[in-house]
């Protein structure tokens, strides 16, 4: 089989398309013929050895896939060869075939494309866990979403509206603002590009405060980090919940007096660990996502597709934060 492999730490330019023996499923596993693989920010980090998961090299990046079952390992029940599935793999998805634990796979509805399926799990499962379990989001509350036109950002916007929140989208361009509005955001605010000095931080904080209104944001969803985090935190409501989802702009440092003054919570969101520790709760969330998908309340936005040999370009686009929605690699 063909696979796009990382042989050494580095950027997308270090990836090489190689031939490997076909993998075989072990006990409790399925072999999936990959038809589509979504690109996410962890793919940027994992090939540079900057992610918490560090697979032995050589390895293929690609953390979520859609495809068809080609073979079934011992003890697997409920699946047959040819079934259409989606799964989060962590890595290994940028290959023609990948072995997946059967318990980690979900059935892809026949009416949905492989491209859509590959773009669903990681971003939407992260966002529903963040908003409901960590953020305790309630109908009528105000949700501020940073980076609202990215994969997890658009998912948070759609889910916020599905749960009847007032959603304020914060983005870096008018094009991204329109994408957030199209996803259902009640309002969108365009913030300048960082980094910021102290005066710039004050301007940014005021921008967020004006966007959410005098009562503040009940929940703030932050997949951006960097200088945006503190500025956003200053717009939080009394007893609000600030969700740390990611930090492509850098790991933020917060003055903790702000949390005291607002009596607010700063909550980390590590969906992968949650799914491993509480698989039943995660499976329930995924079933909810499928229901919302069928109802048309959520819909993964795939802005571009790439062939396997050009997957490095997709990873670079994610790294440079040029993407609206999701990028998907299609594998024929």
Task: Locate predicted features.
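Glycine-rich beta-strand-centered segment in the early N-terminal region that forms part
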Residues: 21-38, 50-92
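NAD(P)H dinucleotide-binding glycine-rich loop of Rossmann-like/cofactor-binding domains
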Residues: 33, 45, 78, 84-147, ...
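Short glycine-centered segments of the SAM/dcSAM-binding site in methyltransferase folds
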Residues: 84, 142, 166, 240-241, ...
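Mid-domain Rossmann-like dinucleotide-binding core that forms the NAD(H)/NADP(H) cofactor-binding site
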Residues: 118-194
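NAD(P)H cofactor-binding loop motif with strongest signal on the N-terminal glycine-rich segment
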Residues: 148, 224, 247
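Adenosine-nucleotide cofactor-binding segment
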Residues: 162-227, 281-284
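Glycine-rich phosphate-binding loop and adjacent beta-alpha segment
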Residues: 171, 180, 227-297, 330-332
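C-terminal capping/lid region of NAD(P)-dependent oxidoreductase domains
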Residues: 290, 295-304, 312-332
């Amino acid at each position: 089989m063909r696979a796009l492999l990382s042989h050494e730490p580095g950027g997308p330019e270090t990836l090489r398309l190689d031939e490997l023996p076909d993998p075989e499923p072990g006990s409790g596993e399925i072999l999936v013929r990959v038809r589509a693989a979504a690109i996410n920010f962890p793919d940027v980090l994992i090939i540079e050895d900057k992610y918490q998961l560090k697979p032995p090299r050589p390895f293929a990046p690609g953390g979520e896939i859609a495809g068809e079952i080609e073979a079934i390992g011992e003890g697997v029940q409920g699946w047959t060869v040819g079934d259409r599935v989606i799964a989060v793999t962590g890595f290994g998805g940028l290959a023609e075939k990948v072995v997946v634990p059967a318990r980690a796979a979900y059935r892809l509805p026949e009416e949905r494309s492989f491209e859509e399926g590959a773009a669903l799990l990681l971003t939407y499962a992260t966002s529903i866990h963040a908003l409901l379990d960590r953020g305790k989001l309630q109908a009528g509350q105000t949700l501020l979403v940073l980076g609202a036109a990215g994969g997890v950002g658009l998912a948070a916007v759609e889910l916020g509206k599905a749960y009847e929140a007032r959603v304020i989208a914060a983005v870096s361009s008018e094009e991204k603002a329109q994408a957030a509005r199209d996803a259902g955001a009640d309002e969108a605010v365009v913030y300048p590009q960082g980094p910021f000095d102290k005066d710039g931080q004050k301007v940014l904080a005021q921008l967020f405060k004006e966007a959410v209104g005098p009562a503040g944001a009940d929940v703030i969803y932050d997949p951006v980090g960097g200088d945006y985090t503190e500025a956003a935190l200053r717009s939080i409501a009394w007893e609000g919940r600030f969700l740390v989802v990611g930090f492509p702009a850098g790991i933020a440092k917060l003055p903790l007096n702000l949390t005291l003054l607002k009596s607010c919570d700063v909550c980390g969101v590590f969906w992968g660990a949650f799914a491993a520790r509480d698989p039943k709760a995660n499976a329930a969330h995924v079933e909810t996502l499928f229901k919302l998908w069928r109802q048309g309340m959520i819909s993964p936005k795939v802005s571009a597709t790439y062939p396997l040999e050009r997957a490095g370009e997709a990873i670079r686009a994610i790294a440079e934060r040029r993407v609206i929605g999701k990028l998907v690699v299609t594998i024929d």
